[in-house]
Swiss-Prot record:
The keyword Transmembrane does not apply. It comes from Mycobacterium tuberculosis (strain ATCC 25618 / H37Rv). This is Probable diacyglycerol O-acyltransferase tgs2. GO terms for molecular function: diacylglycerol O-acyltransferase activity; long-chain-alcohol O-fatty-acyltransferase activity; O-acyltransferase activity. Catalyzes the terminal and only committed step in triacylglycerol synthesis by using diacylglycerol and fatty acyl CoA as substrates. Required for storage lipid synthesis. Upon expression in E.coli functions as a triacylglycerol synthase, making triacylglycerol (TG) from diolein and long-chain fatty acyl-CoA. Also functions as a wax synthase, incorporating palmityl alcohol into wax esters in the presence of palmitoyl-CoA. Belongs to the long-chain O-acyltransferase family. GO terms for cellular component: plasma membrane.
Length: 454
């Protein structure tokens, strides 16, 4: 039995029926040419034949001290693989829409805390011959990006590699840490203390830049929207892929970044959706965007320099060309100021953006206080080249996040071998007809292509 880290325990304490705290992913695979009707069954049999489990896939919350829960891990020595790995088939006609409906139900249900906190579902029956895998793991075990990287380690660049690796028995990667001594620890403590002391001046600097340059977006400048409400327990998931070349063409013609073009594509789709619902705010929606703050000169320096910025999505603007330039200016202004700050201050300011969401459950808070932002839009790096799983080609990889109170819609996308794979998760009650956003994303991209002369 091991004690939990406080941040791991937090995800278990805040979880409820309305707020599942697992992360998920939906992957689509195309069997190799000539594969027979038994391919998926045989694939699943080879998958579950991996009968050794790394510690992370054996642990579940334990109760200690006569009733204290959610502070320690217990480890199962006898894993019921048939419970954790399940094979399902879609009803006829086996549309992608049917797969997404099943995925929505799977993403809604809580993981059983009496068992290790993960599930994997193999789904066949798609009318185009592909099959799917939906995986979910509790956030107390692993974060979404790490889970995606773990899943990618089961894949191979060799289309003839027939081995079916399992995420639960991959050998841990060796960790290399620099030697630690008392002086380095003291240096770290002084660095953190200096960052805390400097936080207030840094915040003033951000405010001054916003006022003088009118480029930055500060927390609580977001309007109230239909997305910033309490969420129910039911989820709806939507997923679709777009060619990265189309987005790159918009990027080049508009003179912006790929991420700017993606944000503009999302902004146009959100504008279409909100107009359709007669719910478009007069002021622009604000997105929280995780970004790399590393300069081009430091691109190969190693380490992590990641924070979050707030982006003006210009959803009140009708012209797509003007909208994408507004988004680009907003992102450039935010990243420029944040890149001048020490890393710990960047992380602290990013945490301040998220802090109000911890109060979202307080009665009346969401209606009384402007939201810090309206939506999270994340663009996650993924594989550049085609990958295969037991000779089946990875055709789509769709990340599915969780949504807290006050954030009823999440958009996460990943780069996958020349495509951008979008995964959308929404509160089933608060964001009706979520799949309409997929059509609006396509319409928005076409608008951008036309606006920049493609």
């Amino acid at each position: 039995m091991d004690l939990m880290m406080p941040n791991d325990s937090m995800f278990l304490f805040i979880e409820s029926r309305e707020h599942p705290m697992h992360v998920g992913g939906l992957s689509l695979f195309e069997p190799p040419q000539g594969a027979g009707p038994e391919f998926v069954r045989e694939f699943t049999e080879r998958l579950v034949a991996n009968d050794e489990f790394q510690p992370m896939f054996r642990k579940h919350p334990a109760t200690i001290g006569g009733g204290i829960a959610r502070v320690a891990w217990a480890y199962d020595d006898d894993i019921d693989i048939d419970y954790h790995v399940r094979r399902s088939a879609l009803p006829s006609p086996g549309r992608v829409r049917d797969l997404l409906e099943l995925t929505s139900r799977l993403h809604t249900s809580l993981l059983d805390r009496h068992r290790p906190l993960w599930e994997l579902h193999v789904v066949e029956g798609l009318n185009d011959g592909r099959f799917a895998m939906y995986t979910k793991m509790h956030h107390a075990l692993i974060d979404g990006v790490s889970a995606m990287k773990l899943a990618q380690r089961t894949l191979s660049a060799d289309p003839d590699d027939a081995e079916v690796r399992a995420i639960w028995n991959l050998p841990p990667r060796p960790r290399t840490r620099p030697p630690s001594d008392g002086s380095s620890l003291l240096d770290a403590l002084f660095k953190m203390a200096g960052s805390v002391v400097g936080l207030a001046p840094s915040t003033l600097k951000l405010a001054r830049a916003a006022l003088l340059e009118q480029q930055l977006t500060l927390p609580f400048a977001a309007p109230h929207s239909m997305f910033n409400v309490k969420v129910g327990g039911a989820r709806r998931c939507a997923a679709q892929s777009w060619s990265l070349d189309r987005i790159k063409s918009v990027k080049q013609a508009a003179g912006v970044t790929v991420n700017d073009a993606v944000l503009a594509m999302c902004a146009g789709a959100l504008r279409y959706y909100l107009i359709e619902r007669n719910a478009l705010p007069d002021r622009p929606l604000i997105a929280m965007v995780p970004v790399s703050l590393r300069s081009k000169e430091d691109a190969d320096a190693g380490g992590n320099l990641v924070g979050s910025v707030l982006c003006n999505l210009a959803t009140h603007v009708d012209d797509p060309a003007q909208r994408i330039q507004t988004i680009s200016a907003s992102m450039d202004g935010n990243k420029k100021v944040l890149s001048e700050l020490p890393q710990l201050q960047v992380l602290a300011l990013s945490a301040l953006n998220m802090a109000p969401l911890t109060l979202a459950g307080v009665p009346g808070f969401l209606s009384a206080v402007p939201p810090p932002f309206n939506i999270v839009i994340s663009n996650v790096p993924g594989p550049v080249d085609p990958l295969y799983y037991g000779t089946a080609r990875l055709d789509g990889s769709y990340p599915l996040s969780n949504i807290p109170d006050g954030q009823a819609l999440n958009i996460t996308l990943v780069n996958n071998a020349g495509n951008l794979d979008f995964g959308l998760v929404g509160c089933r009650r608060s964001v009706p007809h979520l799949q309409r956003l997929l059509a609006h994303l396509e319409s928005s991209l076409k608008d951008l292509e036309q606006a920049v002369g493609i």
